[in-house]
Amino acid sequence: MSSLSDHTPMMQQYWKLKNQHPDQLMFYRMGDFYEIFYEDAKKAAKLLDITLTARGQSAGQSIPMCGIPFHSLEGYLAKLVKLGESVVICEQIGDPATSKGPVERQVVRIITPGTVSDEALLDERRDNLIAALLGDERLFGLAVLDITSGNFSVQEIKGWENLLAELERLNPVELLIPDDWPRDLPAEKRPGARRRAPWDFDRDSARKALCQQFATKDLKGFGCDKLTLAIGAAGCLLTYAKETQRTALPHLRSLRHERLDDTVILDGASRRNLELDINLAGGRDNTLQSVIDRCQTAMASRLLSRWLNRPLRDLKVLQARQDSIRCLLDSYRFEKLQPQLKEIGDIERILARIGLRNARPRDLARLRDALGALPELQNAMTELEAPHLARLAAITGTYPELASLLERAIIDNPPAVIRDGGVLKAGYDNELDELLAISENAGQFLIDLEAREKARTGLANLKVGYNRVHGYFIELPTKQAEQAPGDYIRRQTLKGAERFITPELKAFEDKALSAKSRALAREKMLYDALLETLISHLAPLQDSAAALAELDVLSNLAERALNLDLSCPRFVDEPCLRIEQGRHPVVEQVLTTPFVANDLGLDNSTRMLIITGPNMGGKSTYMRQTALIVLLAHIGSFVPAASCELSLVDRIFTRIGSSDDLAGGRSTFMVEMSETANILHNATDRSLVLMDEVGRGTSTFDGLSLAWAAAERLAQLRAYTLFATHYFELTVLPESEPLVANVHLNATEHNERIVFLHHVLPGPASQSYGLAVAQLAGVPTAVIQRAREHLGRLETTSLPHEQPAAHKAKDAPQVPHQSDLFASLPHPAIEKLGKLQLDDMTPRQAIEMLYQLKNLL
């Protein structure tokens, strides 16, 4: 870039501000537009699909530029934030009428994907998180902040594997890492990763900043005083939040210490495969949350999503939630609460915007309505006798003084912004009322003045008017201008008319225009004072919002329990997982036919089920429904089963389906083996493991060998395992592994068509039905027929499977009839020998053939 002195004064001002924010788009306010210059303009024009032009010159070069109207800002910001961009808003703060040189400007806010708070820029049903990381490959400190709610947490995590799984769960839109970290670390590959100066993570500075923020002497009260890495990360987050918001952050009131040991851990693959709140296509339809979320408020939907993605192992918390749901189901109490909860709205985010001092008039109107609904809701909550619900009721206040203040202050349907006034009610402030009266009565004054002047001058064509450039005026046609009285002072000459002003009109103009600007300034001052009053009550209001969000989630789970026919699971000390008539909560909602419920039993005598059966027979559904039932139990919800008895699990693993990881350079089989390795390294005797078609991505022998060894290892680990396979050889595992049992999904053929019955029955499947499924999928008949021929040849040429002696017992499971993948086909030498026509061979030919056969051995 050229020297700053080479630029025009305005562009010098621009570059002084832009140089402080080199990596962010700068929106530079000029009159009624935000202008964007130079490389920012080229980038913004492409991203926003707006016209790129050029204006004038500075430092001898034309200036690339584009612009947007100031009143359209939010729509463009929303698009940029969704694309992961950050924007610096630079406003005019000086008065153009009195400025000498460029109007004074300054940066008033910085919008980044992780620090936005504007309602229009957020997904109301999803947390908007920003995270920071500090540490090395052995131990990491992770801090996470939701600036739109004030939730602020820290934890320390061992190793990249656990860290990446936690980042997958949290899915922060921005991730801050130290600039002195090596390049291309796994964390930096995440979208939104940004490097920050190493001193932003300084642990001593962070500790002081956090203590100052929370007005405490130390961090012991938050249980994280010794988490030095996490404290450094939290300090970086706090600095970044203050830097972007340009204001104090009173809604950040505490720091929560999270522990992985308190939760049921799900890795990224398991989270995706179970489709908790995002389906495999990236949408939200047909996910677990889409079925069980009927929350009345957006803040409750976000809380439910956090519960689903972070199941708990705290039995006291889970049983308290179960008791609460039972209480809400009693006499259908939830039906009375839910309409009242709907009136509360998303006050969690409204309160955060109040804390950030950027709450809009409609935020205050919604808060007013919510506070007005609290007394009736509080009365209904006092009838709830469950201890946890009683605690929530005790936390929830009614705030009659604040409700009255907002009722007196805010009009029923306020405008979107305070900028143009019209937000505060008449009678709220006498001085404002007087100023507004002067401004609003201007129209009547002009009518009266015009009538008086017509009568005084006798000029019937006289008009009194106003425009923004010249102010108030009296207009006469050019032919009558010479008849104007002596006190008329010429103001403007037009084609066919002359405009004048009188001392009386000038005095009114000064008063009226002054009154309008003074009224806007007065209303803005009163509005800011109203925000400060609300900020002084922020702590109890935020506590009430959190309690109401939880009440909404519990009421929702009660409603779902009733309408989806869910039952309360029972936690026991004995290691087990017993489900009667379990169902898949999502699949049963989309089926047009009744869902076939199935039982499951795992305990100290059986820890693994080998599941066989045809494709489309229901193996994957059976496995997934088991995981979802266990997960729902661990958030305190009722579950889709006639009954469920289980012990606490520590992890849920799934190895179900795979696709190439093209970006990471990994094949389908490599992805499958990576997931399998993770399970074999980390599963315990308290883990639930789902393994579907392990080994299918490689050659038959390799795949079967790997599947067999993996199943043996899981049986030795005593993990609760559902192992679905088409390798029927694995059905002999119960002979060598006493904790393993066979089950199958049944099907039958009728008129050469397969019928899936979806019942889970003991023992292995009788056959694969692969050709029948292929026919059902529309594979051409000729191909199916040719496949039958190949199958017949393979089955007749394979050697019979050698069964262990134990398998010959009468009660042993019958191994299905299928070619043994470990049996050899006839040796090529034997095949060739069998085809020889010895009587037609000469002695020389016979000797040559003997050599050929020897070479085949």
From Swiss-Prot:
Source organism (scientific name): Pseudomonas putida (strain ATCC 700007 / DSM 6899 / JCM 31910 / BCRC 17059 / LMG 24140 / F1)
Gene, per the UniProt record: mutS
CDD domains for this protein: ABC_MutS1 (cd03284)
Family: Belongs to the DNA mismatch repair MutS family.
Cellular component terms (Gene Ontology): cytosol
HAMAP family linked: MutS
Keyword DNA-binding in record: yes
Span list, region Disordered: 797-820
Protein name (record): DNA mismatch repair protein MutS
Keywords: ATP-binding, DNA damage, DNA repair, DNA-binding, Nucleotide-binding
PROSITE patterns documented for this protein: DNA_MISMATCH_REPAIR_2
Molecular-function GO terms, alphabetical: ATP binding; ATP-dependent DNA damage sensor activity; damaged DNA binding; mismatched DNA binding
Binding site for ATP: 613-620
Pfam families: MutS_I, MutS_II, MutS_III, MutS_IV, MutS_V
